[in-house]
Amino acid sequence: MSQFGDLTQEAEEREKQFLEYTAEHFNPDFDDPMAAYEQAYEEGVNYVWSLIEMQETVLLAVTAGMYHQFDKKLREKTIRELSHWCDKEIITPMVWDLNFDQLLKLLEWIGLKIDETDYGDKLKACALVVNVYKHGDGNSHRLLSSTHPEYYPHPTGICGRHINPTHDDLHVTEEQFVEFADAITTFWKAIPEYCYYSELSDEPEWLIKLVKKSEKKLRKGNTRP
């Protein structure tokens, strides 16, 4: 990211600062000039590595923030659209309880084209990246590392004779962040202006079960004294 600047220049500046500091306390009777230069070089390298780690953390945090904002707005819009022909008291908790894959399936049923699109694949990958960033090891990490190894460019885990990525190896570049952002923009543009209940196919079985579950929760809540 731009605020991290030129890392080579940053390293040289750090070396210069270190040498200026050591020069003030240099004792020619005891100190080795070459050792000071070696220490300055190591100081520059260590500083650059700390910047790289910070940059990676910032990129992951920004990716997570962008995704959560998108996810929230998408669920809110889905509820608004469905409330035109469904009971809002039923669909609101149901939509918020859906995982991201289920939400996309619901939108596909409504009429959006998501599967087998570049932006759909990026959105699904982004969701997995954020889950791994938040929760570490788990199903999301295993799925992401097997289907999208590009987010684990430097695997460090050892399993037998193989090197496998760990959840700590997760990495997002600036280019990949832009791809996620572009996918979100493309998705919003792909949403049709109108969705009509009469054009929907039969409700899939998984959706019927979720609706019934939400109805049951609503009835149970209404019967409480």
Question: Model-derived features: where do they sit?
Answer:
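Flexible secondary-structure boundary motifs
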Residues: 64, 68-174, 178, 182
